[in-house]
């Protein structure tokens, strides 16, 4: 079985056109971390530049500034690396081109493998990978396996830091480099192999039974986020649902989990 972990950093913003409002991500760094059992891990790192036109930048100026300072520590006007990939000047075309390049690399990495598990940790890359429909691949969000955040992992597991590396593109000391994050998540996956690989082995609980289980847990548990009717609680509610299944040893595939989220309007 081939395991593939993907992480994408870039500038996410709102794009307004004749089709309405669209949330898109213009990539700046992409890391694809992949390995098989009893083999050394391999890493593919891609850098991008361009792709943010003046209108897109102006509309999302405040959001881009926040992302630069607090998330990935890239700047819009930084000089591209010698091996950086130039994106089209039109933002929508840049978005499509970035996705296409990632798809092509994933196809190349996964070809000739009969069993593939594509892993991601939240983020838009999960939707991208699902839309690619890679042959023989199952897509799994690590959040749905109750994998802690990278920040929590490095606080609880100091040995994760000593053996994890980053790249010089980010402010030193930042834990938001995709290379660093993939190394940390790889450590967690190694320690939780049975949970991760179990995704491919266990049959999923049917939708109707999964809903009944969650309804039962809502009625039985005293402290849960569904007691607060607020959109701000949506992510906590999604995490709580996923945690209930994992803690009780119940496997629910991504399609059924998404249907449950939709049932409770957790968009």
UniProtKB/Swiss-Prot annotation:
Keywords: Early protein, Host-virus interaction, Inhibition of host innate immune response by virus, Inhibition of host RIG-I by virus, Inhibition of host RLR pathway by virus, Viral immunoevasion. Induction: Expressed in the early phase of the viral replicative cycle. It comes from the Viruses. GO terms for biological process: symbiont-mediated suppression of host cytoplasmic pattern recognition receptor signaling pathway via inhibition of RIG-I activity. Plays a role in the inhibition of host RNA Pol-III-RIGI-mediated innate antiviral response. Mechanistically, interacts with host E3 ubiquitin ligase RNF135, disrupting RNF135-RIGI interaction and impairing RNF135-mediated 'Lys-63'-polyubiquitination and activation of RIGI. Belongs to the asfivirus I267L family. Interacts with host RNF135. This is Protein I267L. It comes from African swine fever virus (strain Badajoz 1971 Vero-adapted) (Ba71V). The lineage of its organism: Viruses, Varidnaviria, Bamfordvirae, Nucleocytoviricota, Pokkesviricetes.
């Amino acid at each position: 079985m081939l395991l593939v972990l993907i992480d994408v950093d870039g500038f996410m913003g709102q794009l307004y056109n004749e089709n309405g409002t669209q949330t898109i991500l213009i990539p700046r760094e992409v890391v694809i971390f992949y390995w098989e059992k009893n083999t050394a891990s391999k890493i593919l790192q891609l850098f991008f530049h361009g792709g943010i036109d003046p209108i897109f930048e102006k509309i999302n100026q405040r959001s881009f500034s926040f992302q630069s300072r607090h998330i990935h520590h890239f700047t819009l006007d930084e000089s591209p690396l010698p091996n950086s990939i130039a994106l089209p000047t039109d933002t929508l075309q840049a978005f499509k081109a970035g996705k296409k390049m990632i798809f092509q690399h994933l196809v190349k990495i996964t070809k000739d493998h009969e069993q593939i598990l594509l892993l991601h940790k939240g983020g838009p890359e999960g939707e991208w990978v699902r839309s690619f429909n890679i042959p023989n691949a199952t897509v799994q969000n690590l959040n749905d396996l109750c994998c802690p955040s990278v920040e929590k992992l490095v606080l609880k597991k100091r040995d994760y830091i000593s053996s994890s590396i980053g790249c010089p593109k980010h402010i030193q000391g930042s834990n938001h480099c995709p290379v660093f994050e993939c190394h940390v998540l790889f450590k967690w996956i190694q320690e939780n192999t049975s949970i991760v690989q179990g995704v491919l082995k266990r049959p999923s609980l049917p939708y109707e039974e999964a809903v009944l289980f969650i309804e039962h847990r809502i009625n039985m548990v005293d402290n849960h986020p569904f007691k607060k009717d607020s959109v701000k609680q949506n992510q906590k509610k999604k995490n709580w649902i996923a945690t209930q299944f994992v803690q009780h040893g119940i496997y629910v595939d991504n399609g059924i989990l998404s249907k449950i989220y939709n049932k409770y309007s957790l968009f």
